């Protein structure tokens, strides 16, 4: 009975203590809010930073910039160590008074320090003569000696008549690709090809404007393919096709007469037969090959061929006149 009477009293006492604790917590929280509202924001931030950093929060003194590298470079230094590979222009590493840009107020162009014009353009500071020599020395163990028989350009052209030309470009734009880099030009001396008279004339006819008569050179330019190697293969293919097609003889080609020829040929022509008959009647009995080997006959042959192929000009007529006088001993 006593226990049942004391239980309500204990519960009411517990409620009173809880209320007192909650009121004291609210009072302390309100005091913190009032103090923080009174202090300025900068003071609170400074106090927080000082508490977080402590000794480490102190700023270190700024380092002074040293002298540029160009002032410490030796005269006989290894330049390949300064610019070992391709790189942009570095004013602190190039000991040259380089200037570039538009001069302001009729002055001199801007100096190299802070000059964007020098940084934008490509340079060849990594390809000095000393660097190229070092590269050549490093590649020597992997190369063979130049053939001793090819000691002149004439011999090189004789043994290697085909010349292939292409171009490489250095660009400072957004793309490294240049459409002209894929173009391949193949040149070959027409006389160096193994052709007879029929094949030689037919190849000239098939090549059309690709053949230059003054230099006797056949030029094939290919730019249809997107890659240089493809254009090279296509140029070699065209040369092979021209060579083999020139050797083919069609049925209609056998019906060509002397009047259908592209050029005048003195061999077996009426002019040759007439001059041989005239010389035989004047000088007596002589062999045909002996008469053809004489220099006077050769000069007459050249003058007639020149006049037939290039027209009857004053120079050609005078040359023909002198050849006839020498031939007939007039």
Swiss-Prot record:
Residues 50-73 are annotated as: Disordered. InterPro entries: Ribosomal_mS35_mit (IPR019349), Ribosomal_mS35_mt (IPR039848). It is found in: Mitochondrion. It comes from the Eukaryota. GO terms for molecular function: structural constituent of ribosome. Residues 64-73 have a biased composition (Basic and acidic residues). One of its GO terms (cellular component) is mitochondrial small ribosomal subunit. Keywords: Mitochondrion, Ribonucleoprotein, Ribosomal protein, Transit peptide. GO terms for biological process: mitochondrial translation. Its main location: mitochondrion. Component of the mitochondrial ribosome small subunit (28S) which comprises a 12S rRNA and about 30 distinct proteins. PANTHER family: MITOCHONDRIAL 28S RIBOSOMAL PROTEIN S28 (PTHR13490), SMALL RIBOSOMAL SUBUNIT PROTEIN MS35 (PTHR13490:SF0). Belongs to the mitochondrion-specific ribosomal protein mS35 family. This is Small ribosomal subunit protein mS35. The lineage of its organism: Eukaryota, Metazoa, Chordata, Craniata, Vertebrata.
């Amino acid at each position: 009975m006593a226990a049942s009477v004391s239980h309500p009293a204990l519960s009411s006492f517990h409620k009173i203590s809880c209320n007192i604790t909650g009121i004291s917590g609210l009072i302390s929280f309100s005091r913190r809010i009032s103090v923080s509202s009174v202090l300025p924001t900068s003071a609170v931030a400074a106090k927080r930073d000082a508490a977080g950093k402590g000794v480490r929060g102190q700023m270190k003194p700024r380092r002074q910039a040293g002298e540029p590298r160009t002032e410490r470079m030796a005269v006989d230094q290894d330049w390949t160590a300064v610019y070992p590979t391709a790189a942009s222009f570095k004013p602190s590493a190039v000991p040259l008074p380089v200037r570039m840009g538009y001069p302001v107020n009729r002055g001199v162009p801007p100096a190299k320090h802070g000059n964007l014009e020098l940084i934008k353009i490509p340079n060849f500071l990594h390809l000095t003569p000393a660097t190229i020599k070092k590269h050549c020395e490093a590649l020597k163990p992997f190369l063979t000696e130049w053939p001793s028989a090819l000691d002149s350009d004439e011999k090189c052209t004789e043994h290697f008549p085909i010349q292939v030309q292409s171009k490489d470009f250095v660009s400072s734009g957004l793309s490294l690709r240049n459409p002209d880099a894929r173009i391949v030009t193949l040149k070959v001396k027409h006389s160096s090809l193994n052709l007879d008279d029929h094949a030689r004339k037919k190849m000239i006819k098939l090549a059309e404007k690709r053949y230059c008569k003054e230099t006797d050179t056949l030029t094939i330019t290919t730019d249809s393919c997107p890659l240089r190697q493809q254009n090279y293969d296509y140029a070699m293919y065209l040369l092979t096709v021209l060579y083999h097609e020139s050797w083919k003889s069609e049925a209609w080609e056998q019906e060509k007469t002397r009047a259908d020829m592209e050029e005048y040929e003195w061999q077996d022509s009426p002019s040759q037969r007439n001059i041989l008959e005239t010389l035989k009647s004047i000088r007596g009995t002589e062999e045909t090959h002996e008469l053809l080997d004489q220099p006077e006959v050769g000069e007459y042959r050249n003058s007639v061929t020149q006049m037939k192929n290039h027209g009857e000009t004053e120079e050609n007529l005078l040359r023909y006149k002198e050849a006839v006088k020498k031939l007939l001993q007039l």
